[in-house]
Amino acid sequence: MTISVARGVVMPRHLAIGGAHRHAAGMATIAIYSLKGGVGKTTLAVNLAWCSATRSARRTILWDLDPQAASSFLLHGTAGRDQAQAMFSRDISVAKRAQPTPVAKLDLITADASLRGLDQLFHTLDKKKRLGKLIGALTDYDRVLLDCPPGLTETADQVMRAADLIVVPVIPSPLSQRAYEEVIRHLGGKVPVLPVHAMVDRRRRLHADALAANPDWPVIPMSSVIEAMTVQRAAVGAFAPRSTAAAAFDQLWRTIEHRLAAGSAAD
């Protein structure tokens, strides 16, 4: 049996969740990643972390690995001066870097500008599973979500080795689809991927055609309430719980939890 992950790309069902990536009993790592920037990656990361903590009552931590620190801003994180990279090169407890957020059961590890040098640091350290080892120390959490910087970099490779599931936002456009297929080729079937149509306007012919080509992909709509996150500094479900966007994030999170549960059963 196989499950389709992209048109022309399939993944064996036994890879529905990468059991080999599990760090502790019950813990799962979910990376939100895209080769391209500007596709709604941080929006997904914050809303999925909120759903994990509130809808599933999971002990959740969002680790912001993007030097732009957008997730850190949205969740009211307090970043130290150029400290985010230090956890990777020094003997610093990653758990002690966790900060509470205004959301119960949701903690945050903030980003800062020092992460711009993270790729070079990984090359220097030559430790292929450094990120995975640090995640493994987060034993107080059920779900670890990673807001990843764009690009096929050493940081991306570290993420791919550590993740149980990679969520990839894809804008309904040929360029975004092409970037997604490049990610699939790079992974080579080693890590399960969940593509998500993001920033969707069903009135646009291009978007409608893309959705028709991949009808099984979850869909996150283009929405003014999502844009309002930067003003509210909160997940959509916190300030617009009855919105279409909030329902879409809830449904996406249920899909993710189902995948994780199916993977645990297969293990």
Segments the model singles out, each with a brief description of its role:
Residues 4-24, 189-267:
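C-terminal lobe/tail of nucleotide-utilizing enzymes
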Residues 55-139, 226-234:
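P-loop/Walker-type NTP enzyme "switch/lid" segment
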